[in-house]
Every structure is written in C-alpha cells, then in structure tokens.
Amino acid sequence: MPEKPVLIAGPTASGKSALALRIAAEQGGVIVNADASQGYDCWRVLTARPAPDEERQTPHALYGHLNAKVRYSAGHWLRDVMPYLAGEARPIIVGGTGLYFTALTRGLADIPPTPAEIRAKGDRLERAEMLAALDARTRDRIDNANRARVQRAWEVQMATGRGLAAWQDETGAPALPLSAAQAIVFDVDKEVLNARIEKRFDLMLAAGALEEARRVLPDYDPTLPAHRAIGAPELIAHLKGQISLEAAREAAITATRQYAKRQRTWFRSKMRHWSAYMP
C-alpha cells in the first residue's frame, strides 16, 4: 500500500519543485503538476516547468499536456489527477494553483458547463466590468485581481443565474481529504521571495524565454488563459515593438511579485491546517 500522497503548495519561485524532486529521489513516487500555467505545451522556460533531464530522472505527470487553445478548469484537473490517486506510485502533487488543491481536498461544486457564447462575451469584457456584476459573497471569496477567476465566476453567474459562492456551498465530498495526505505549504519571507523572483526571471531570459515567446507570437491571443502566463504579455509587448526588453523584464518581475503576494494571501487564508515549510 503506497504511503499517503504528498501535497506541496506555495508561491511561485519558492522552491516547491526542488522539494518534490528530493522527495521523489529519496522515497520514490510520481510528481504531478498542480500549476495551471505549467499544464500548457507552449511554455516550458517561462513557466518554470521541470527540465527534460528532471523529467527523465523522475516520473512526471500533467506537465505540458494541453494545447494552448484548450480551456482547462479545476474540474478538468481534478478528473485528470484521479488516476494518480488510485495508482501504485505515490503521487507528489506540487504547484501554485490554490484552487486545484482546494478542489482536491475540499471537493468541487457540480456546476453546469458554460455555453460558448457566454464565454466569448466574457472574453470581450474588462475584468472590472465582470467583477461589478458578481454577487457580494462571490466577490469576497475569489481573487479579485485574477482575471481567470473573475471571468469564471461571471460565466457561472450568467449561465446559471446563481453566484459561484452558492454553488460552492453545495460542494460534495472531496477526492482526497486533508487527513489522508501529507500537506505542505511553503512560507517564504517576502524579501527572500522577491529576490528569488528577480533572479529566476533573469535565468529564464538566459535560458530562452524570449525565444519561447517569439514562437507563440504568431498565434498570440490575450483572451486565452495559456497566453496570460506571468511574463508572457510583457515579452509579447516587447516583441511587438511596444516596449524595450528592460521594460518588459521589469514589468514581468513586478507582475510575478504581485502574483506571489496574492498566492501567499490565499495560502495563509485557505491552508491554515497544512504543515508550514520554511526553506
């Protein structure tokens, strides 16, 4: 019987993947992705997906398995992760998408699919417009700065006539109760994390992130979640001649730090019962 699954959550650039690799090397297991951006095949460098040699050393799953045009929700991820929970290899589930972990350990509401015409309308709206249309309970529950989360909540409300919070309150049993897992959440000092973010983005540029963005440029669509990966809009703007590379670098680092701040707030609010890990 495999040991309890390991869950590793934390903000971007905190060192989650390194810990997952170490656990897998010492104890075995399969590393399963729980980061929305790392699921897309158009990015490896920019989203800090595991390197090819790391993937050869240890089994990895749900990395780069999605075409950029695919709309992928927490429900899709939960469906895809289920075989690894039932498999013989111990799953080491690692990532920074808090909603995935919440769906896994607290359950997911059975919300009807969103009609294509409603999604298309949402793609054309500004985040603030959609946010203003949400009920107060839903606004209080989601990350108001995350466009994907705001649009998802707006789509649910438009399609069903009910707020996302109301649907979530009817959530069924979780696939993996927290008591059945070894749950670790990274708690990294803000200044340390900010320095790591800057250093990592410079390493990404050196490793080919700009070339990655150049390959995406002909098909770039800012309405696609895949193309809203942190750093992508900034590098695309540079490639279009709108800003300098240095300005793109600074904007991407700022955006990453803002994202990390939102992640840390989420984790501290939603993962109080997880074991804190301070690298």
UniProtKB/Swiss-Prot annotation:
Q: Which SUPFAM superfamilies match?
A: P-loop containing nucleoside triphosphate hydrolases
Cofactor(s) the record lists: Mg(2+)
Marked site: Interaction with substrate tRNA: 97
Key word tRNA processing present: yes
Gene Ontology BP terms = tRNA modification
Q: Which reaction does it catalyse?
A: adenosine(37) in tRNA + dimethylallyl diphosphate = N(6)-dimethylallyladenosine(37) in tRNA + diphosphate
Give the E.C. number(s): 2.5.1.75
Q: Where does substrate bind?
A: 12-17
Cross-referenced Gene3D superfamilies, in alphabetical order? Answer: 1.10.20.140, P-loop containing nucleotide triphosphate hydrolases
**Briefly, what is this protein's role?**
Catalyzes the transfer of a dimethylallyl group onto the adenine at position 37 in tRNAs that read codons beginning with uridine, leading to the formation of N6-(dimethylallyl)adenosine (i(6)A).
Give the similarity note. Answer: Belongs to the IPP transferase family.
Assembly and interaction partners: Monomer.
Q: What is this protein called?
A: tRNA dimethylallyltransferase
Source species, please? Roseobacter denitrificans (strain ATCC 33942 / OCh 114) (Erythrobacter sp. (strain OCh 114))
